[in-house]
Amino acid sequence: KMTPYSENGSPLILPAKVSKQSYRPAQSNIPNDKQVRVFLKKLVSNYVGKTGVVPPIGIKELREHAVAVLKEARLEGKYENYTAILVSNQAWRDTLAQIPYDRRLLLLPKCLRVEERCPAPFDEFGLLCKECGLCSIQDLSVEAERLGYAVLVAEGSAIVRQMIETGKIEAVVGVSCINVLEKCFPHMEAAAIPGVAIPLLQDDCVNTTVDLDWVWDLIHLTSDDK
């Protein structure tokens, strides 16, 4: 391959290829239109600021807030669980921002990979990314590790509980389907660990997609962002 050069003769450093997700429609209990999801997220941000919601929040209270937001948004009640996650994220946002990167865990699901072409093996902790560039797992995990995060590409609530119990993790940034997030919630609530979660747009466990810009935002979140 020829190396490209700038006008002054120095070699150009090209950015790494950014992996793209194939478009897939969202499951029925998540708004399919990205603009609607962004609108809902902004509405949640305003609502939490206005009502002064303070974490940790029990699941019953979260659902009440979600119902209030959906009523204001004039959106269907089937989005209640999704909206409850957005409310919880917004409530924990300032707390997460205060926690150093090296005390945070990034938890990614293996189903973000391109399953039929992924070369990565598994061990007892989860997927061992080979950094092939086919999916977003490489970009997210490499950047998070550069910042100081512990990173796991694994499923389920048991891993989260184990990491919390080590005492080395003070916050969790997770990407997962709504079903798994609901199972993890009691462990997070019991430990009063700040946890933010970006829901996968599908829960069928194969070649799933996520709002990647939201994941990047939360990975980089610091107190300097205020």
Where in this protein do the model-derived segments appear?
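Proline-aspartate-enriched helix->loop->beta-strand connector
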Residues: 168-169
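A short, acidic, amphipathic alpha-helical segment used as a generic capping/interface helix at domain edges
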Residues: 156-165, 180-181
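Redox- and metal-dependent alpha/beta enzyme cores, enriched for Fe-S-associated oxidoreductases
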Residues: 96-149
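Short, charged, surface-exposed secondary-structure boundary motifs
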Residues: 163, 182-187, 204-211
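Electropositive, gly/pro-rich neighborhoods at or near active sites that engage anionic ligands
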Residues: 1-110
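Short His-Asn-centered micro-motif
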Residues: 108-109, 152-156, 173-178
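Ser/Thr/Gly-rich flexible loops in soluble cytosolic domains mediating phosphotransfer, phosphorylation
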Residues: 194-226
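Short, structured coil segments at secondary-structure junctions
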Residues: 147, 191-193
